[in-house]
């Protein structure tokens, strides 16, 4: 079974003195239903140096030991709001590029992929708690939960889908098996065959 390393959102609880990594259980369920093994990635290890690993960060040590087959950048948090998470996802993308692993970015995950490629973010209206009809290579109706979008398709990617108001909703890397989706496939009442089939195709590439 192929393993999928999944980045996690960061939630702070100052009254308890805790900062927690969090992952929607439905996302792990979706990955399992698609036939893969989900492996959540701890965020703070990206900021730590292992005393027994010289210059390697804790994330690099984790990746070298776990050896995931696929990287998934999940939703939640805004890009730039949480340094440990940004560092984790930057390291995951570097590892994926070096090893030519498939990457799927969901919502914030797609935004992070775009920003790492030199893209910029812009605020949008009407994209929170709404539905959009897609046009392009991917069609259908999808959910929407984001306040920001990529201002344009990053240079290393090609667009796969747009919303009715012209915002980029999906993209594919021109050289690597990487895709970004702005919708949340895990938040559907029933998982969509379209999303599961596309996930399987991407993860097996």
Task: Label the predicted regions.
Residues 177-181:
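Catalytic His-Asp charge-relay segment
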């Amino acid at each position: 079974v192929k393993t999928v390393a999944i980045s996690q959102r960061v939630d702070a609880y100052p009254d308890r003195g805790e900062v927690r990594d969090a992952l929607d259980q439905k996302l792990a369920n979706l990955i399992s239903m698609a036939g893969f093994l989900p492996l959540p990635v701890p965020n703070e290890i990206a900021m730590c140096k292992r005393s027994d690993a010289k210059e390697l960060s804790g994330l690099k040590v984790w990746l070298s030991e776990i050896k995931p087959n696929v990287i998934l950048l999940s939703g939640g948090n805004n890009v730039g709001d949480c340094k440990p998470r940004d560092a984790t996802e930057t390291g995951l993308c570097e590892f994926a590029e070096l090893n030519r692993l498939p990457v799927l970015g969901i919502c914030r995950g797609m935004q992070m992929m775009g920003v790492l490629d030199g893209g910029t973010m812009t605020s949008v209206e009407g994209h929170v708690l709404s539905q959009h009809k897609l046009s392009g290579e991917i069609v259908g109706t999808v959910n929407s939960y984001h306040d920001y979008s990529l201002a344009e398709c990053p240079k290393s990617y090609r667009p796969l889908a747009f919303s009715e108001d012209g915002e980029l909703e999906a993209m594919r890397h021109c050289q690597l098996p990487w895709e970004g989706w702005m919708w949340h496939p895990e938040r559907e009442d029933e998982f969509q065959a379209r999303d599961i089939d596309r996930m399987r195709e991407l993860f097996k590439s």
